């Protein structure tokens, strides 16, 4: 893999994690391909969800590997109540081992989301983020100074492109229960569809955001407070911002950056809007003041 594009003080830890993922992809794929991988367990995780078997197997595999890195001080899975902490190290990892697990049985795209934090689990301390998506091919996307896309082939990640969103896209991934959408959001969505936008919502956040990124524009939204800040929202918000898009929420009708949100508890949830510039402008126009 070509690491020359990685710059800045966090480049080395990103390279270490990518090298670890590169070595572990086949094991992860093996976990996902087991016949009972999508079967639900009888457990409940810290967020109140019932994990599937692949959730727990991937979580265990990733935790062990992340903790093996000398410069990692803390590892925190969405499946756990609290982080696992070591004595030494500078960086903290928060991750969702299997985003989209609820649609895995339908053979939809799923993935692993990783946020790399410094000093503390706060949005302002997010140094970089990565995700791996598993489908008919395996891809890695990295947000550092820019956003880089790779494809896994013959045991290595191969560079595809640097992702930069265009001003306007053509797809909408609108999650949540539509009967609970605000009037402003309903009008915004009607406007998008009147302009021939295509609905591309799968139920897997990492898949839908990946679609927006590789298509170079569009909008992902989840207006209900369901998505976890540390494990999903912040890492993917960084992705979209570094790709020249916007990542935001609305607080009493005022548009605010997701990466300026505070974290009162580890498993706190948030609404989430990730969009290219045009879609962000339209959403603000209709949702402002609500």
Swiss-Prot record:
Known catalytic reactions: beta-D-fructose 1,6-bisphosphate + H2O = beta-D-fructose 6-phosphate + phosphate
Keywords attached to this entry: Carbohydrate metabolism, Cytoplasm, Hydrolase, Magnesium, Metal-binding
The family this protein is said to belong to: Belongs to the FBPase class 1 family.
Matching InterPro entries: FBPase_C_dom (IPR044015), FBPase_class-1 (IPR000146), FBPase_N (IPR033391), FBPtase (IPR028343), SBPase (IPR023079)
Gene: fbp
Protein name according to UniProt: Fructose-1,6-bisphosphatase class 1
GO molecular function: fructose 1,6-bisphosphate 1-phosphatase activity; magnesium ion binding
Binding partners and assembly: Homotetramer.
Pathway: Carbohydrate biosynthesis; gluconeogenesis
Annotated localization: Cytoplasm
Species this protein is from: Helicobacter pylori (strain ATCC 700392 / 26695)
Highest rank taxon of the organism: Bacteria
Chain residues that bind Mg(2+) 1: 78, 96, 98
